[in-house]
């Protein structure tokens, strides 16, 4: 039997094939029909375009017997070898599938015709139509940024953590929320996220052994009984473990965030559900920031007697608005270099009226948090926000303190070409000995791909530097304050800001050049990523011991000045973390201790020792 196969548009182009006894899936590749030929066989969806007739040479014959779709494969078009091996399950028609999913009907006389085809329609869901065909009726700046790329930028990506409901766009200050106990003394984004936040806190507890050890100690004594601590720090799962530890030690706490972008909303909700007065949410405005601090301090029937600060904003606010509170405050514990600098300024001016503990310069903070935490989190923050590859990139790191050292080491290990700027000749020499080229920022600003500040200073990167940067240069800050980069100078009419991701802005110049600004110049790692919990355990334990020390110190031990944590306490913090590594300390013999002039139980180094 001879079978002739042809399409109306490409009859002469159809190659000869042999049809064997194969399954439809196996037979499809054997048909050898070109895409054009197959397309020509299929009638246009909806009957085709009546205003675009086929050329005369390709038009089908006039209607008549054997014409129409069934005639697209007529015996007169051409010949193919006899299909001797084809099996027929139907005595009248044999179905054979084409490549495009249509069917050919083989009649008893050998004519192959195209079967009527079912047009497949893709179901469009309502939300899909809105996303692609409509502009959302209500888009806030933050909701739009989340919808663009939530999973790669948010610190904890989860449907439980972020919602796109209209309620999410309502300011927490305008909401009336209560926890399960009916308490409303808090202000968070959404109290319903508490369960998710509680799971994050429980995970963090597994990596914070020292704080958990302090809680066990609290079962027998309450060293912070009667303490009323007002705190202003980053509100993360690690901070929550610290706050609950302080509560277990007997303290009452009220808390606000020290950074408008670093708060984990679900963690804040979990703390509020547990009864902690927390006033913080991710994405606060400047007005919200100070309002939250004021709500922690200005409370009827409650007055703080201890301050735990990170950056000095809480201390500054109390000095400015409620100076009389310092009559009952026993001390200040400050974590960051920015806040410590402000404390030393107050002390130098004779305005510091209570003792202050400088946690930032303690050994356990400097050598662990500032170095190891930043070494890991700088890469995490950059990767989540930009998806960049580090190998071969030219990076300038401004400042070679412990934070700068960690950033440089991480980037160098990933293959980046790293430059360093520094004002201190000792730190500068360290950078050179570590293999980094010491430069002035002006010397490399036109060529670098990334600029990272970690100095604790102001206007390290000026508008002049920003104007001279190359197109698509990434600019970010690893210091506490948002003053290191002169972001204010970029808010001018001639420059255009585009939010492309959460915490990622393109600042565009009139000539089309743009820079990529991360977290609006605020702390990159806690605004855009996460930090290693174990390292933060060391810092949080140091803060807790500093609070215990100042609160219980006899009158006269500490004057109105700034102090470092006693060396013995630094060593105690370190010892609490050693069991995690199954580490075993060597003990001095009596003879060795006498020879070194040390107590067998420490401290083992003098205060002037540089680790």
Swiss-Prot record:
Superkingdom field: Eukaryota
Keyword Membrane: no
GO molecular function: hydrolase activity
Main localization (coarse): cytoplasm
Binding positions for substrate per the UniProt entry: 236, 310, 335, 365, 369
Catalytic activity: S-adenosyl-L-homocysteine + H2O = L-homocysteine + adenosine
Assembly with partners or alone: Homotetramer. Forms heteromultimers with AHCYL1 (via the C-terminal region). Interacts with ITPR1; with lower affinity than AHCYL1 and maybe via ITPR1. Interacts with SLC4A4. Interacts with ZCCHC4.
Name of the protein: Adenosylhomocysteinase 3
Species of provenance: Bos taurus (Bovine)
Gene name of this polypeptide: AHCYL2
